Every structure is written in C-alpha cells, then in structure tokens.
C-alpha cells in the first residue's frame, strides 16, 4: 500500500528530513539529528509536522452529554475554549485510544461542537467506534479542516517565537486552552482560520496549530527563517518518553487499563454518569491491579527497548514497553509493566538486553519535569 504524505511532506524533504513509514504515513524521523533536535526543544524551540494525526469534529445537540457516555473523564469540567486529555475504553476497561477533547462551545449554526485529536494509527477504528456509539444521536462526525496541516512548536522559546510570527498574543492562553484565529497576516485566504491550542507531547511549553496547507507552509517557512529547529519522530519519541507521556501501542493498548497505566486520574468514578468500561474500572478500583506501569533506569549503558524482559529475583516478571537513551538525563530510561507488589520506587530489578542481564532500578515518573 502506498504511504500517505502530509501537506508539509515536500517542505520536510527540502530540509533534509529522513523519511520513514509510520502509521501508513511517510514521516520524517530526523533532520539534523535526534540529539540536536531533542536539545533544541529542551533548551530553545523546535517544531514538528504532526499532520498525520486524526482531527475529528462532532457537531449537533447535547454533544458533551453523548460524549460523556464514551469517556471516563468528566467532560463537563471543561467549557468553551478549554480542552482535556482522556481515553476511549472497551467494556473490559482496556484503552482503545488516548485523545484530547477541545470544547468549541456553540457555533454560529446554533450547534454544539467538540474537536477530537486522536492517534493516526487509531483514526479509522476510532471513527467507526464513534459512529456506532453515536448513531442514534443527532450528531455529525466529520474531519475537522479536511486536508489541513497540523504543526507543533515546542520549547521554552515557543511563546515568544510564535507570537512574533503570528503577531498574536499567546501568553494569555492557558495550558490546554485553545482559540480560533480568523484575522491574521499569515492567512493566505481571508476565509481561512488557524486553530491553535496550548498543548504538546514533549513535556515543554508549546503549541499545536491547524490551518490550511497554504497557510501552514507559509508559517512553517517563517518559523524556519526565524531559527526554529525542524524535528522528527525520533526526537518526539525521546522527548515524550522523558516526560513519561504514553505512546499508544507501546505503553497503553486494549489490554491495559487506565489504573494499570498510571492514568487513574482520568477516571472520575465520583460522577454519576455511566460510561463504557465503568463496571470493569469500578471493580479494579476496589480490588486493585495486578500490574502497573513503572519508570525504569538501567544502571549501566544498556538500553532497554520495547519487548525486552524485566526480571526480579532472576525471574521474568514484566516487559519493557518503551525505552531509550535520555539525551537530557544522560542515562538509559524505560517504561515497563511489572507486578503491582514490586512496583515501588527503588526496587532493584534487571532488564534482559540481547540475552544479557543488566541491573536496573524502578524510579519515579516522569523522568523529566519542567514547567508543568
């Protein structure tokens, strides 16, 4: 099957992006090099083409009431121009996807609207699942800004850099706040708009914005001209792992629940509303989990990768879900599921790397925290 290309594919190629297959897309894994890109985001500012992500709009009546039946988080805690991170669940409590819900309030058409940003690899199944569960509601499901380009700009200098380019005040936009910009010198067409949110996947200050391909290309080039470092999937992965942000398919999947994955804070059992997976999570909240996701530091130079066994008292007890060399901390880090009874900070364990046992220790998550 031919790989899909984002609207910024050519721009990435021209900057030397090394393209690789990812979730049926052809995406840049790196430009100048993973370490340089990683450090640019931690110390200055970098940007990513994330146009492969799924962006879906729900419009109609009583949107949030309908959506509340599908997620374990209280969506009424957010209002217009606010957003929240949450998960879709199966009846057994397993995670179907993680996503961000953006509340757009009531549109000019007198319809309620929310925008969902979902994982690229789960887009098709998520939309089918939404359609099935919302079929009896007066709700339309469509792609938000079809053919649009989505850019993430991340790092301590992201606010000042983006404010200069967009000529728009952004420091007053709260974390997980969002707005639609309809009048801006960067807009190629006066009928267009820029959807911008103070969100990210790096553990740093940052924004993500969606616009038409033409406007996105113009802003992309302006950001490059201002010295912003283009970054690929490689740096995006090391940055998110340092911040202990989950990667669907690695750290969370249909066989893991929010309580097991350290995402219990997303489950609001105190609200009266029923939701898919509630009974399973109520039971797990009562009796506890058999496994938990933990942070691991390998104590030598060995790098734990997805699928590597975790040992305790010389017995295999778990498996690594994500692992890398941390450019910021200068040590090997990983996430892994282990039995709940040993999921305690400072527990001595081992990771088997290419047939050899390496000493490791369970540590606090996130490995890196800055600002938030």
UniProtKB/Swiss-Prot annotation:
This is Aminomethyltransferase. GO terms for biological process: glycine decarboxylation via glycine cleavage system. Pfam families: GCV_T, GCV_T_C. HAMAP family: GcvT. The glycine cleavage system catalyzes the degradation of glycine. It is an enzyme of class 2 (transferase). Its EC number is 2.1.2.10. The glycine cleavage system is composed of four proteins: P, T, L and H. One of its GO terms (molecular function) is aminomethyltransferase activity. SUPFAM superfamilies: Aminomethyltransferase beta-barrel domain, Folate-binding domain. Keywords: Aminotransferase, Transferase. InterPro entries: GCS_T (IPR006223), GCS_T_bac (IPR022903), GCST_C (IPR013977), GCV_T_N (IPR006222), GcvT/YgfZ/DmdA (IPR028896), GcvT/YgfZ_C (IPR029043), TrmE/GcvT_dom1 (IPR027266).
């Amino acid at each position: 099957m031919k790989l899909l290309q984002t609207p910024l594919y050519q721009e990435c190629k021209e900057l030397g992006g090394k393209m690789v297959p990812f979730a049926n897309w052809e995406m840049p894994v790196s430009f100048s090099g993973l370490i340089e890109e990683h450090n640019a985001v931690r110390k200055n500012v970098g940007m990513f083409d994330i146009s492969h992500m799924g962006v879906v709009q729900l419009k109609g009546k009583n949107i949030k009431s309908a959506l509340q039946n599908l997620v374990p988080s209280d969506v009424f805690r957010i209002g217009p121009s606010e957003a929240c991170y949450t998960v879709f669940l199966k009846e057994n409590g397993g995670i179907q996807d993680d996503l961000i819900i953006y509340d757009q309030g009531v549109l000019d058409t007198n319809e309620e609207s929310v925008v969902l940003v979902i994982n690229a690899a789960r887009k098709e199944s998520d939309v089918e699942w939404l359609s099935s569960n919302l079929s009896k509601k007066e709700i339309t499901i469509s792609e938000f800004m079809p053919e649009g380009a989505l850019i993430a700009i991340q790092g301590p200098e992201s606010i000042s850099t983006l404010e200069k380019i967009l000529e728009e005040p952004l420091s007053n936009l709260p974390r997980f706040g969002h707005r639609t910009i309809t009048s801006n010198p960067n807009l190629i067409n006066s009928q267009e708009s820029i959807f911008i949110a103070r969100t990210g996947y790096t553990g740093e200050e940052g924004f993500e914005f969606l616009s038409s391909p033409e406007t996105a290309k113009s802003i992309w080039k302006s950001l490059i001209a201002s010295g912003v470092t283009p970054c690929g999937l490689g740096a995006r992965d090391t940055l998110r792992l340092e911040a202990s942000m989950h990667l669907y398919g690695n750290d969370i999947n249909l066989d893991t629940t929010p309580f097991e994955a350290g995402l219990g804070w997303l489950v609001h059992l105190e609200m009266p509303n029923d939701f898919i997976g509630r009974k399973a999570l109520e039971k797990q909240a009562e009796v506890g989990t058999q496994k938990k996701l933990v942070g691991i530091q390998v104590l030598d130079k060995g790098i734990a990768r997805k699928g590597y066994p975790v040992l305790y008292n010389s017995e295999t007890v778990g498996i690594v879900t994500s692992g890398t060399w941390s450019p910021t901390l200068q040590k090997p880090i990983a996430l892994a599921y282990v039995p709940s009874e040993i999921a305690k900070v400072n527990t001595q364990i081992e990771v088997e790397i290419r047939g050899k046992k390496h000493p490791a220790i369970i540590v606090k998550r996130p490995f890196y925290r800055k600002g938030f």
